[in-house]
Amino acid sequence: MKMMDGLRSIALLATTLFALPAIAADVLVENAFLPGAEGAKGEPVTILISEGRIQAIGAEVTANDVERFDAGGAIVTPGYIDSGTSVGLAEVSGLGTSRDGRVEEVRNAAGFNVWTALNEGSSLIPFAPTDGVTRGVITPSADEANFAGESALVRFVKGDKFLARASLAQHLYLREWNRRGAGGSRGNALQVVLEDLDEAARFLRDQRQYNSNKARPFSLSTRELRALGRVIKGERLLVVHVDRAADIRKVVSSFERFEDVKLIIAGGVEAWRLAPMLAEQSIPVLLNVLDNVPESFDRLGARLDSATILDKAGVPIAFMSTTPYSEFRSLTQAAGVAVANGLRWDRALRALTEGPAEIWGIEGGRLAEGEVADLVFWDGDPIEIMLSLIHI
């Protein structure tokens, strides 16, 4: 079957996936629309794609000797980015033998990297692109160790290379239930974390002595020291999973002495209380807007409009699903909940696309010349969960 016949067939099936970046030939996407106000159709747009990148975009773009793709009047957006999920690391939440996302019974797991355990054949992965999620940050979870290890960036679109970046960020857990390994006190947990970072800093300073076995002994393994060294040098982001405002404030102030550490707050149920401080220091917050119930003493300040407060203050935000056991559509559902509670529609879309791309320091997330052609086509409002994705 010729390529054009294949495209026409795809246009008839809302559940069929079409990976534009995987096409070697130049493609001209016609009859598409940019998102307008509140999810309505905006300006008509034609997009020229070559070698998986947007070469030109606008109302007057034309090209010869290209394959043509009729978007059928659909709204086009960049693919969504899930800023925190464990898909590919587990299949069944209650079955321990299917979970590979955490290291148990160790004091420090900073050297663990989830990409070594990722299963690109997971039964859960095909659900991601059907909800417009084309990339995801796969995060480790914590057992007794507060430092849980490094996350990885993956692509969910069939035909693309699955692993996009093997080592993206280090993850540190300091929530109410993450204090067992520190004797039951979150205060001691933070002190131990700072001591580990100090030890990693000494490891970086004493490399020559260490290599010649002349350095004072370290309590951490070489793998953990190197992983934390990457954080100290700013080579890896540090994602701190924490909810209580008092804890967030202590984390921010405690890490100020590590000048190159790049902090991100994940969860941040009470981060809205510190919005001016976080905005001033340009510390991003990764939110699960649906996680808004005050189910613990860490979350007494939970509220539905936290994304609105943070965004209005100028805090960079992005949305995450946090678990693979619910539909990826929870990302768009979260965006819709945020809009219903005051977040501007365009800012909600940004928190799924350009926002996370900037926070994670990865390309894409924008419809612009030179960007990766990571395109998703919708038959209506891109954050309305009752509408369908047409193509990806």
Question: Predicted regions span which residues?
Answer:
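Bacterial N-terminal signal peptides that target proteins for export
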Residues: 2-11
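N-terminal signal peptide c-region/cleavage motif recognized by signal peptidases
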Residues: 19-21
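Histidine-rich, glycine-flanked metal-binding segment
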Residues: 34, 38-77
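His/Asp/Glu-enriched, well-ordered alpha-helical/loop segment
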Residues: 92, 99-111, 237, 279, ...
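Polyanionic/metal-chelating signatures
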Residues: 124, 129-262
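Glycine-enriched alpha-helix->loop->beta-strand junction motifs that scaffold or abut catalytic
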Residues: 256-262, 280-286, 314-316
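Conserved small/polar residues in nucleotide/adenosyl-binding loops
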Residues: 390-392
